[in-house]
Amino acid sequence: MSKKLYRINEWFYSIQGEGMRAGTANLFLRFSGCNLTCSRETEGFDCDTEFTSGESWTADQIVAHLRKLSAHCPWVILTGGEPSLQIDDDLLMNLKDAGFSIAIETNGTKPLSSLIDWVSCSPKTAEHTLRVERANELRYVRAYGMGLPKPSIKADHYLISPAFDGSRLPTENLEWCLKLVKENPEWRLSLQTHKFIQIR
């Protein structure tokens, strides 16, 4: 039985609001801590998570608590903060043994285990080197006037979302993202549905 502790900020059972898996039921496991410092910008383009606090749990305790939240949900999403700072094969194998498929939402600054089933890489506004070799989806948030970066990794899907702080419809940003997609048809528009319908 593993005694390593993982610091967890929160967990909840909800619907994935963005990306190619939007609309599907998932257990969310949010890890504390991040290796980037993203400052607030005028377009709401900052870190949307209070990730510094949390409690420590073992891998066995994490699995047990997730199954209390849902006994039948097949997917768990590892998010943060930056989950790659804490996760290891011991935790991933515990999740696999419990029957979970594993998705991760990462900034891409750390290499990832092959045990992860779905990689959603979302580089932040500050430029940083990506250490993941490839991703199932590469997601960027864009505000009005921001161009599309040239992807430095291979992905199955390339997605852009209009910057949205959840308080008002981001009409200008949305129209800009629509323009970007039309000009770059290999990209797809991805709305942050959970913010529009105000769910977690």
Where are these regions (language model features)?
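Flexible, acidic/Gly-rich N-terminal and inter-domain linker regions that tether
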Residues: M1-D46, E183, R188, I197-I199
